[in-house]
A protein has these predicted regions:
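Helix-to-loop junction immediately C-terminal to a conserved catalytic motif
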Residues: 42
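Conserved signature/switch motifs of ABC ATPase nucleotide-binding domains
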Residues: 120-123, 141
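Conserved ABC ATPase "signature" region
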Residues: 97-117, 169
């Protein structure tokens, strides 16, 4: 897959296969095309070459089978918490009756800890609360793929930790397929099953994939105390350092006990 505008190629030859129910994170420097790739998967942009295949079918337009959570709290400002979630759920499950829709929406409001705030408009919510609404709305639609575009980038550190924990809980309960792009290495290790490492752009490439073998459900403190956690973090940080714009040589220094693989396949 290649994406570019005019003479600029953002990334090239990205082949990534994601199994159903996997949580995959993509890490790389700014400008490597992470968000562009996510937008292509979402159907919001088109690649100059290649294709996205979902369940054996090529996709090139937005759809309810892919829900995106952006970092900019993309809620409808004139609607309440309940209404923002209800609108998406009703579109996805038009055949449900009113009571079933209501109970289902309330379930996800409770799941993200917003019970009692369902009638508030986005302007009355903190950044963390707004992003909780976005996550609840995305999970509630039951998409085939949930796309997270640095969803916690604009949230303070303490709130970010709490919402990451809620995201782990929701993923455990739903087993959604998730593709997330992030600059936060610790976040990627904690949340994901595999971490795709991108070289620096322009003409960025998918260099390798790090397998994160921690069992689920995960408890933050226990995971961060594991020797393997430190090894994976060191490996990825070294990769990013070696692939900074100031360094011409690519590729991370192999780390003992870190399982990596070259990208294969071409499906999402």
């Amino acid at each position: 897959m290649e994406a570019g505008g005019g003479s600029l190629c953002v990334f090239k030859d990205v082949r990534l296969h994601i199994d159903k129910g996997q949580f995959v994170a993509m890490v790389g420097h700014s400008g490597c095309g992470k968000s562009t790739l996510l937008n292509i998967i979402a159907g919001l942009e088109q690649p100059s070459e290649g294709a996205i295949i979902l369940d054996g079918k090529e996709i090139d337009t937005p759809g309810l089978d892919r829900m995106v959570v952006f970092q900019n709290f993309s809620l409808l400002p004139w609607m309440s918490v309940y209404e923002n979630i209800h609108l998406a759920v009703k579109a996805a499950f038009a055949q449900w009756d009113r009571k079933r829709l209501h109970d289902y929406v309330q379930r996800y409001i409770h799941m993200v800890g917003l019970a009692g705030s369902e009638h508030k408009k986005p302007a009355a919510l903190s950044g963390g609360m707004r992003q909780r609404v976005g996550l609840a709305r995305a999970f509630a639609v039951q998409p085939k793929v949930l796309l997270l575009d640095e969803p916690f980038a604009q949230i303070d550190a303490l709130t970010r930790v709490n919402i990451q924990d809620e995201l782990m809980h929701m993923w455990t309960a739903t087993q959604n397929t998730v593709f997330m792009v992030t600059h936060d290495v610790e976040e990627a290790i904690l949340l994901s099953d595999r971490i795709a490492l991108m070289t620096s752009g322009p003409e960025a490439e998918l260099a390798e994939i790090v397998d994160v073998g921690f069992p689920r459900p995960r408890i933050r403190e226990q995971v961060m105390d594991l020797p393997e956690y430190s090894r994976i973090k060191k490996y990825i940080m070294q990769f990013l350092k070696n692939n900074s714009r100031e360094v011409s040589a690519g590729g991370a220094v192999p780390g003992a006990g870190v399982l990596v693989s070259k990208p294969v396949g071409a499906e999402a």
